[in-house]
């Protein structure tokens, strides 16, 4: 990203470009320089504002180098978190690794969730209402064998009507997976 309009670029932008180049960054968008400049200016303003507060607290007429150092140090301490020392991390890792892992109940392989919770299971249902027959159903041999000879014909008709009405009241639910389309 070098070359075009190099003489029109402000000094701060040239410094940012040289910093990027020294870090090994050769290809970047022009907006990157503007974003770094904005971050840089904002950081400097915050540090100088804090230095001015420290200077006023010390009843000094001007900001001096010690105020700026104190402001930078307070920014570093409170803005950027320092990782714990390596020894502390090793000690924490050793104490954590002493606890054995729980034994696996499942067999070998990857345990899968129940089928109803997977994306491969059918997630739809079709409701197929059963058509009610308006005419009297024909009696079959099975129906004749099941009838009690002691019942009157009227009681038999009521019993048949009740048995034929039950399946029509409950809809039948059907679910099936979609098959792949032939290519």
UniProtKB/Swiss-Prot annotation:
UniProt keyword list: Acetylation, Activator, Nucleus, Transcription, Transcription regulation
* Protein's cellular compartments: Nucleus
Start and end residues of each Histone-fold domain: 10-77
What SUPFAM superfamilies would the database entry show?
Histone-fold (SSF47113)
Keyword Metal-binding among UniProt keywords: no
Which segments show compositional bias classed as Low complexity?
148-172
According to its UniProt entry, one GO biological process term is: DNA-templated transcription initiation
Keyword Ion transport attributed: no
Q: Where is the composition biased (Acidic residues)?
A: 136-147
Q: What does the record say about tissue specificity?
A: Expressed in roots, leaves and inflorescences.
Chain spans, region Disordered? 101-183
Q: Which GO terms describe its molecular function?
A: protein heterodimerization activity
Q: Which GO terms describe its cellular component?
A: nucleus
Q: What's the domain of life for this entry?
A: Eukaryota
- Report the InterPro entries cross-referenced here: Histone-fold (IPR009072), TFIID-31 (IPR003162), TFIID_subunit_9 (IPR051431)
Question: At what positions is N-acetylalanine found?
Answer: 2
For this protein, the record's PANTHER family field holds: TAF9 RNA POLYMERASE II, TATA BOX-BINDING PROTEIN (TBP)-ASSOCIATED FACTOR, TATA-BOX BINDING PROTEIN ASSOCIATED FACTOR 9
Q: How does it assemble?
A: Component of the TFIID complex. TFIID is composed of TATA binding protein (TBP) and a number of TBP-associated factors (TAFs) whose MWs range from 14-217 kDa. Interacts with TAF4B, TAF5, TAF6B and TAF10.
Which family is this sequence assigned to? Belongs to the TAF9 family.
This chain's function reads: TAFs are components of the transcription factor IID (TFIID) complex that is essential for mediating regulation of RNA polymerase transcription.
Q: What is this protein called?
A: Transcription initiation factor TFIID subunit 9
């Amino acid at each position: 990203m070098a070359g075009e309009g190099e003489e029109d670029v402000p000094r701060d932008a040239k410094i940012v470009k040289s910093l990027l180049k020294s870090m090994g960054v050769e290809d970047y968008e022009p907006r990157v320089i503007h974003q770094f400049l904005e971050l840089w200016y904002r950081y400097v303003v915050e540090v100088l504002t804090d230095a001015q507060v420290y200077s006023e607290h010390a009843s000094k007429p001007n900001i001096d180098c010690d105020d700026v150092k104190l402001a930078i140090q307070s920014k570093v301490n409170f803005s950027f978190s320092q990782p714990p020392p390596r020894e502390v991390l090793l000690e924490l890792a050793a104490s954590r690794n002493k606890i054995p892992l729980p034994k696996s109940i499942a067999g070998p392989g990857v345990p899968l969730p129940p089928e109803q919770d997977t994306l491969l299971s059918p997630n739809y249902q079709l409701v197929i209402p059963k058509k009610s027959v308006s005419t009297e159903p024909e009696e079959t041999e099975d129906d004749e064998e099941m009838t009690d000879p002691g019942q009157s014909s009227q009681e038999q008709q009521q019993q048949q009507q009740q048995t034929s009405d039950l399946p029509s009241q409950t809809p039948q639910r059907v679910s099936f997976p979609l098959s792949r389309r032939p290519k």
